[in-house]
Amino acid sequence: MKFQSKRGFTLIELLVVIAIIAILAGLLLPALAKAKSKATGISCLNNNKQLGLAWLMYCEDFDGFMPPNQNGGGSRGWVNGWITFNANATDNTNILWLVGSKKQVGPLYPKLGPYTSSPGIYKCPADNYTAKMGNKRVARVRSNSMNGFIEGAAYNGGKNRGSTWYSSHKPYNKLSDISGKDQAGAFGGGVTSPTELWVFVDEHPDSINDGWNIMNPNTDASWVDLPASYHNGGGTYSFADNHAELKMWKDPVPKTEPVRQSSRNGFSNRGKRKGMNDYWWVIERSTSRL
């Protein structure tokens, strides 16, 4: 009886198989990463919508008045605390500055706290940045900020005054204030209805600090506070009618602004497109001229 020996792989054949697997992996991994980023983008949109719903519930309970949105970490705002990359900053991990009650926190309690039960909605799921606390790294509790032109009577100004920071432009204290000229920035376009006024945004990890996000409506030379680009170069916004959008950035800032893990503000708008660019897109959804 004759036995036929079984032929094994040659080295060349094995290398070909390995090369094919490597090529397939190279094709599939970016697609998987993009799919994961898309999934976190959807989750982030949902978080912003939940915050927007809490914001509207507050407005309904207070006769249309919006929650106060005062700058500064020790302010009476919709949230409190100061998010930073500085070591041993307790605000980085204090969820009571997000969802704490007046009984728990005192008069500086976060005004949306009673309307939100889950601290997770205050953070983008793609925000994996940490800060040092003692001898370990810990996750920071918040990624979101509110439109700085939404003041919610935080500064006790008169009915007909301009924004506390940019007097030629409109602030918003009540829902009934959401109207105005179709003109905000250099190229037309401004807030005329709730569908056009953004309320919450995910802020760039280096830029975020208090719960307040402002931009200069008179020039696009630099971003005072910078939106994030966690989702394939895009960032999420929620609006006063409680719809949410994923804005895909086109300009280098904010699309590819690096995260240095160093708290900073004032981002040069280098590489911006001439004319209507990402900066003016945000301004036209932030306020309108008086």
Regions found by a protein language model. Name each.
Residues 1-2:
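N-terminal hydrophobic targeting signals that begin at the initiator methionine
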